[in-house]
């Protein structure tokens, strides 16, 4: 079984830029701001250090979150409506979950989530 390759700083940076392009497609202002922030963070930590592998891993994880969990909404203005409506741009990379926790919570069961725990560590 082959080990997962560890990306270089340049590879992580390019992965982050691709993720911003996917997540913020059509929103030039946010796309530009996200890319500027990524560049600023990489420029600030240009020198190799003890924490370089952690920073590279952080960039890879950030790219994954941007690509799979960020959904943008565009405000749709229809004449005659009193409420605000948004059209969501859901693309093929968005992580789609199941509704198992909603179904079990609807049966008088409470899903407990402790502070500091992730969804994968919850107990029902």
Curated annotation (Swiss-Prot):
It is found in: Mitochondrion matrix. Signal peptide: none annotated. It comes from the Eukaryota. GO terms for cellular component: mitochondrial matrix. Its main location: mitochondrion. This is Mitochondrial zinc maintenance protein 1, mitochondrial. Belongs to the complex I LYR family. MZM1 subfamily. Interacts with RIP1.
């Amino acid at each position: 079984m082959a080990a997962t390759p560890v990306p270089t700083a340049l590879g992580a940076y390019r992965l982050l830029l691709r993720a911003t392009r996917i997540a913020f497609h059509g929103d030039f202002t946010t796309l530009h701001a996200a890319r500027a922030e990524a560049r600023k963070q990489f420029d600030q930590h240009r020198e190799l250090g003890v924490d370089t592998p952690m920073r590279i891993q952080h960039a890879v994880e950030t790219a994954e979150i941007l690509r799979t969990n960020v959904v943008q909404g565009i405000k749709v203005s229809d004449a005659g409506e009193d409420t605000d409506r948004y059209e969501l741009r859901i693309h093929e990379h968005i992580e789609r979950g199941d509704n198992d926790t909603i179904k079990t919570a609807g049966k008088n069961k409470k899903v407990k989530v402790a502070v500091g725990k992730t969804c994968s560590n919850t107990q029902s």
